[in-house]
Each structure stands twice: as C-alpha cells, then as structure tokens.
Amino acid sequence: YIAEKVKQSEFSLSQEEIRPYFPLPKVISGLFAIVERLYGIKVQEHSESVSRWHDEVSFYQLFDADDNLLGGFYFDLFARSGKRGGAWMSGFQSRYTYAEQNHEQLPVCFMVGNFTPALDGKPSLLTHDEVLTLFHEFGHGLHHLLTQVTVSDVAGVNGVEWDAVELP
C-alpha cells in the first residue's frame, strides 16, 4: 500500500496505468523467450491433448535443445468463483526413476494465479506486480521441472526447506 502511494506521489504512476503495457499473451511469450534464451529449452502449448478442469486452463510441455521432453505444466491464471485467492506453484508429479522398469517419470506442476481474465475480446492486462508474480511462480515451476534429481522426495522444490524456497 505504502509503496504504491510513494510511486503515485513521486512518479505520478499507478499500477492501473501500467496495465495496457502488459497484455498477458505478450508477457507469456516474453517469459518463454527468456527461458529459451537462458536455458536453451522450448515451451510448447499442448492444451488440447490433456484433460483440463476448466476451459481457461492451458497445458505446456518443455523440451531441451535436442527435442527431448523434460516435463509439463498447467497454467491456471484467472480468477473465478470458488477458486482460492493468491498465486502459487504446486508440484503434481516429481521426477522419479523406476530402475527396475527402466522408466523415468517426468515432472508436472501447476502454476496458479488470480489475474483478471480477458474481457470483451480484449486480452487480460497485468499490473507490474502481477508480471513479477507470474515470473516468480514460473521460477518455482522451473525449479520443479528442470531438476536432475531422480528421487521424488527430494527432487525440485521437495528437497528445499520452505523458508528457503522463497529466497530467490
């Protein structure tokens, strides 16, 4: 609250005035471009190939530079009736190797937000704080998805104390 008031006072700028500069589709494509540049991984949408609990939920898969599947994630980014408030990442399935069957279970996670949905054919517009939230939760998702640890109890964020998970 105070920080927002200082921004308004010092810079005559509010979060609401910034929204038009952050349409969600462009923020997501920019986020994916950064991830590809930094980590050499590609993010591809595959929403139609999986079951989803709501039409606004999307599903993506991550691939390395050699097109090997690394894992997948769901984006459930919009507020709706009956949905818990806030933003978070939850691991659904951790990386795990079944040595006896020579099989590797790939990680899957959910990244959840409560952004304002698109209205009247116009895209969802984010505040700067919401952009930061999306990047923050996506960072947790990458931690879960890109782990090389193959024991699910300690793979990704599972092996990190909760107070340390939020340090970055």
Residue ranges and their predicted role:
Residues 1-114, 164-165:
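Active-site-proximal, well-structured secondary-structure segments within enzyme catalytic domains
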Residues 20, 24, 123-131, 154-158:
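Alpha-helix N-cap/helix-initiation motif
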Residues 35, 117, 122-145:
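Active-site recognition of the HExxH zinc-binding catalytic motif
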Residues 79-82, 120, 151:
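A short local loop/turn or secondary-structure capping micro-motif enriched for an aromatic residue
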Residues 145-156:
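Glycine-rich phosphate/pyrophosphate-binding loops
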Residues 150, 159-168:
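Post-HExxH zinc-binding segment in Zn-dependent metallohydrolases
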